[in-house]
């Protein structure tokens, strides 16, 4: 039986016209996406005379994979930071809830007095309490969490680098609180304050759309004794 002779031109043609398979790389993790990007870039480099339609196809695939890689890296970073600051955020949320409940009771009490000046002040404090609670819930998972109730800093307060760092931290905290306040004023907060007060877990599906999913509170176990909760909350005073 005569041997089949392979035509190298056909092989070259197939390599030039081979379709790009990127679907299996989507959602597969950064390592596989990076490998796929390298494969396509290598293919383009080895075939400078690709047909125009294939060149467009490969370029589009590269752009899509690079976006997917960026999303994957952001998600990985969010997972790391979420784990790192999980307990800090949990206790700060508990503290913000407790403070807001007290502010609501105080506002109701003062409202009954009919004293405008006191009512106005209490209303402002109430709004600040609502902003604090929303801050803890909405602070981006892709950033190092900036505490609302930071513990005393043992670093040298005269060190220029320390002073600069504290200033940047305070500016970011103030900036995000203003962002929360704007959302509330425009009625765009993706959840209700009452839901947060009821202890529901509010998970954002997408930071851009700010779509909230409400479930049972599962962040961490409840303290069995109120004194234990108070002691842990006071850690952030």
Curated annotation (Swiss-Prot):
Residues 228-237 have a biased composition (Acidic residues). Residues 1-24, 206-237 are annotated as: Disordered. InterPro entries: Efg1, EFG1_rRNA-proc. The keyword rRNA processing applies. Residues 53-113, 166-186 form a coiled coil. One of its GO terms (biological process) is maturation of SSU-rRNA from tricistronic rRNA transcript (SSU-rRNA, 5.8S rRNA, LSU-rRNA). Its main location: nucleus. It holds the Pfam family Efg1. It is found in: Nucleus, Nucleolus. Keywords: Coiled coil, Nucleus, rRNA processing. GO terms for cellular component: nucleolus. Belongs to the EFG1 family. Involved in rRNA processing. This is rRNA-processing protein EFG1.
